[in-house]
Amino acid sequence: MFKTLDRYIIRQFLGTFFFILVTIMLIAVVFDISEKTEDFTKMKASTWVIIRDYYLNFIVYYSNLFSGLLIFLAVLLFTSRLAHRTEIIAMLSSGVSFPRIMWPYFLTATILTGLSLLINHAVLPSANKVRLAFEEEHIRATYHVNEKHLLREITPGSIAYFESFNTNENIGFRFSLENWSNGELTRKLTADRAQYDSVSGAWRVSDYLLRTMDGSREHIERGQMLDTIINLKPSDLGQRWESSMAMGWTELNAYIKAKLAQGDGSLMPFLIEKHQRTSYPFATYVFTLIGVSIASRKVRGGTGLHLALGVLLVLIYIFTMKLTSVAATNAGLDPLIAVWIPNVLFALVGIWIYQKAPK
């Protein structure tokens, strides 16, 4: 049964959190509108379509993205207010233990964690699919290719190579297509450039050289133009990592498996996205533990000092997240470990602060 204390803390927790969430989202929408005003005036989409397809899904995405940090600020704010009004001291003096005070906090954190997990795995992919489709239709390109020396295994034994690729013109430079059988090269097509025809789905190669090996014999063919159909699209060479956010769990796993089979080495953002969908919601428990442990102590600086400490910890947490993501991308750190390191480190910090909290 919920006691008056439990209902009071849960009401304060949720009320403060949703107030901060609504305020931050209103500010974010205003800033985004001011930034994209020129884009909106150029596009043919109606105001209703912009609101329905873009901003409603924009709010869903960023509300969930910042939920952990906003929960932390909410806990700091209302717990600091309770401490400033000596309500925490009154609870402890009346015989209520500090772990008992923590119970409604963690009950609320469990509700918010479950909600975030549900949104991450069931709601957000569909919302992001609509939002990103709107952005790609009206604001930005669907994909981009920044890498050099692109290598893709189209089918077993069939390998395509581009030295560089121009996404605006769908043209690849220094193109080659190799066919291997039993460890031996049987056919190799090289060309100065290859342009993709989106209508026919074929690649048109220019100034090509085709070598065909038949045992000890080699046939060479040169030409100015040749159309060849291969199971490769420009979007397979480079896709915005944000597209991973629009994929459901099954779709994301299938995409990762297919790209690994092609030898695509740019999958780390997709792997990080996959594991973060589960790891990030659990940061709610960590933020709640740290927030209560810091803000429950009545200090001379009051709420201002608690907020300053909270902002500092948030910045360190974000820095740790970025650091581990970079380590996963560039240093070979396992992405599953990388996304959980910030939670584990800050959980240890939270336990230490909790032990120092007044009881």
Enumerate the predicted regions with their spans.
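Transmembrane alpha-helices
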Residues: 1-156, 167, 184, 214-216, ...
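Structural signature for solvent-exposed beta-strand/loop edge elements and short helix-capping sites
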Residues: 154-200, 205-208
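N-terminal amphipathic/hydrophobic interface segments
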Residues: 191, 222-224
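Short solvent-exposed strand/turn elements
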Residues: 207-215
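An exposed, glycine/acidic-rich loop-and-rim segment of catalytic or binding clefts
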Residues: 219
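Short beta-strand/turn micro-motifs at beta-sheet edges
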Residues: 226-228
